[in-house]
């Protein structure tokens, strides 16, 4: 009787109908996570984050916890005289081609809509194949933007550097636009047919994580 009560509480009480496309996506993700390459990728994410954090600190940028042991870090802008400038810095970095998120920091008395921190991580750049030396370069670009966030010419200079950097580390090495078009057409056709499980259209594509 107890088992029946638990089962009925879980379904339909707490769970709805299964989504086959989500189940398939999870299966693919779990399969990828079992591979040695994923372990190496995860280690590189942390190594990259530590390299970026160390470089930011050496450039006078304050980090909450004074470093990182995982995939992300939180910049405290207050020691740089930029209390409540998180949103402005986020937008400036975005103009320069660097994606971060405005974020509150401990004991931040600024509004969460205009906080005093920036959160950034390394999984995306690691997926492109970048390593520690590239993290140092990115950290240097971030520091330039933080100190010159109102200078449009500086932002454009950094953007040019970032564009040059990412062009050397394409998401799918060797894949041209013309080669990608048939895959895109297949996905569009599947969507137009109302087929939700389209993830396998990309099964032959592997980001550069090694």
Q: Positions of the model-derived regions?
A:
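Generic non-transmembrane alpha-helical segments
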Residues: 51, 55-59, 88-96, 145
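Conserved PLP-binding catalytic core of the aspartate aminotransferase-like
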Residues: 62-129, 179-180
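Active-site C-terminal subdomain of aminotransferase-like
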Residues: 1-82
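Low-acidity, Ser/Thr- and Arg-rich intrinsically disordered low-complexity segments
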Residues: 184, 192, 199, 203-207
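PLP-dependent enzyme catalytic core of the Aspartate aminotransferase-like
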Residues: 112-181
């Amino acid at each position: 009787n107890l088992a029946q009560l638990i089962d009925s509480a879980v379904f339909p009480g707490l769970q709805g109908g299964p989504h086959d496309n989500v189940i398939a996506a999870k299966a693919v993700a779990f399969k990828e996570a079992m591979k040695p390459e994923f372990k190496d990728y995860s280690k590189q994410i942390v190594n990259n984050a530590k390299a970026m954090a160390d470089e930011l600190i050496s450039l006078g940028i304050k980090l909450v916890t004074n470093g990182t042991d995982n995939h992300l870090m939180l910049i405290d802008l207050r020691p740089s005289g930029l209390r409540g400038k998180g949103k402005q810095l986020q937008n400036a970095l975005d103009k320069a081609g660097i994606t971060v998120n405005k974020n509150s920091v401990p004991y931040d008395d600024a509004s969460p809509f205009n906080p005093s921190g920036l959160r950034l991580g390394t999984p995306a750049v690691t997926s492109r194949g970048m390593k520690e030396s590239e993290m140092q370069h990115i950290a240097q670009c971030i520091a330039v933007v933080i100190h010159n966030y109102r200078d449009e010419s500086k932002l454009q200079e950094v953007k040019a550097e970032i564009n040059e950097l990412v062009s050397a580390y394409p998401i799918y090495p060797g894949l041209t636009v013309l080669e990608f078009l048939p895959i895109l057409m297949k996905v569009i056709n599947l969507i137009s047919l109302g087929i939700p499980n389209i993830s396998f259209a990309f099964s032959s594509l592997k980001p550069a994580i090694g």
